[in-house]
């Protein structure tokens, strides 16, 4: 990830009272292909980091479907091709959520995400 994105991640984490937790380019996220369709809002939630999995799950639309095949694994280094607007949120720690749309941003803590 480039230096500007890392600085933006730290700024967002700090502004919202969170510790910055790195998400390496070599790590994986769970993502739905619908993020490439221009659907809003875009949502992200972060479970604890396990191995090479960042804990991030990202999807577009209001609700997260319960379908087991909803998320596909993707290395963070490819997110710039899929959904570059989420990169600046990937420094939020496990137990965080975000939702973004045109001129809208919401970031909050959800400790239930830590109980996985």
For each predicted feature, which ranges?
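Short helix/strand-capping turn motifs
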Residues: 14-66, 74-77
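Substrate-binding/catalytic groove segments of enzymes
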Residues: 65-67, 97-98
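Short, compact, well-ordered microdomains
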Residues: 75-116
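Alpha-helical protein-protein interaction elements
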Residues: 10-12, 48-51, 81, 100
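Extended, charge-biased low-complexity segments
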Residues: 1-14
């Amino acid at each position: 990830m480039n230096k500007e994105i890392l600085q933006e991640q730290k700024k967002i984490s700090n502004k919202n009272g969170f510790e910055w937790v790195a998400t390496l380019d070599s790590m994986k996220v769970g993502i739905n292909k619908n993020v490439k369709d221009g659907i809003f809002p875009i949502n992200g939630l972060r479970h604890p980091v396990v191995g090479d999995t960042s804990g991030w799950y990202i999807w577009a639309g209001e609700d997260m479907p319960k379908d087991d095949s909803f998320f596909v694994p993707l290395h963070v280094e490819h997110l710039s091709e899929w959904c570059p607007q989420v990169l600046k949120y990937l420094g939020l720690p496990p137990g965080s959520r975000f939702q973004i749309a045109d001129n809208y941003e919401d970031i909050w803590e959800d400790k239930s995400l830590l109980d996985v």
